Amino acid sequence: MKKIRIKLKSFDSGILHRSTKEIVMAAKRNGALVSGPIPLPTRVSRYTVNKSPHVDKKSREQFQLAVHKCLLELSSFNAHLLSTFTNFQLPAGVDISVEVRDE
């Protein structure tokens, strides 16, 4: 049995949530069994930089970048669903990777 594993990444959790809802609704309309969305751990990168280039070592600024991730698994799908995902329009800022697996 083949399964489709869809991983979504975004810097904005709201956009990621709306995109997963759209994908789940499209999959259910085409008769696929959906397991998920499964939230994956958020990767947070923190950066500390000096405010001044010369003196005042104690004066620093901190930035952070959070990457939110989510996983969907679809089973019992048809070829029409695959063509739907290739033409699917996601908002800017959402990265999608689609993987077809044999299980």
From Swiss-Prot:
The entry's cellular-component GO terms read: ribonucleoprotein complex; ribosome
What protein name is recorded for this chain?
Small ribosomal subunit protein uS10
What residue intervals traverse the membrane?
Answer: none
Which family would the database say this protein is a member of?
Belongs to the universal ribosomal protein uS10 family.
- GO: which molecular function terms? structural constituent of ribosome; tRNA binding
Which branch of life, at top level?
A: Bacteria
One of the GO BP terms on file: translation
Q: Which Pfam families match?
A: Ribosomal_S10 (PF00338)
Function of this protein?
Answer: Involved in the binding of tRNA to the ribosomes.
Gene3D superfamilies in the record, alphabetically? Ribosomal protein S10 domain
The record describes its quaternary structure and partners as:
Part of the 30S ribosomal subunit.
Keyword rRNA-binding tagged: no
**InterPro entries membership:** Ribosomal_uS10 (IPR001848), Ribosomal_uS10_CS (IPR018268), Ribosomal_uS10_dom (IPR027486), Ribosomal_uS10_dom_sf (IPR036838)
* Signal sequence residues: none
Q: Which UniProt keywords apply?
A: Ribonucleoprotein, Ribosomal protein
